[in-house]
């Protein structure tokens, strides 16, 4: 479930997904229990669904066809 709410100031394109991805990584067992960096945990496969959604959102910013349809994500 997204933790991003509409009353927060907009942090640019895909800001909500970026914030949720960071929160997911910081709350993961990899960071909390094992003490690894969020970057290492992201490479190991934690929060894959948010990582993919963030990638698709960023890609849709550059895609000319998606400019008319709107950005994917929130």
Swiss-Prot record:
Keywords: Disulfide bond, Phosphoprotein. Signal peptide: none annotated. Pfam families: Pet191_N. The modification Phosphoserine is found at residue 37. Residues 27-65 form the CHCH domain. GO terms for cellular component: mitochondrion. A motif (Cx10C motif) lies at residues 30-41. GO terms for biological process: leukocyte differentiation; mitochondrial cytochrome c oxidase assembly; multicellular organism growth; spleen development; thymus development. The keyword Disulfide bond applies. The keyword Disulfide bond applies. Disulfide bonds join 30-57, 41-47. A motif (Cx9C motif) lies at residues 47-57. Involved in an early step of the mitochondrial complex IV assembly process. PANTHER family: CYTOCHROME C OXIDASE ASSEMBLY FACTOR 5. Belongs to the PET191 family. This is Cytochrome c oxidase assembly factor 5. It comes from Pongo abelii (Sumatran orangutan).
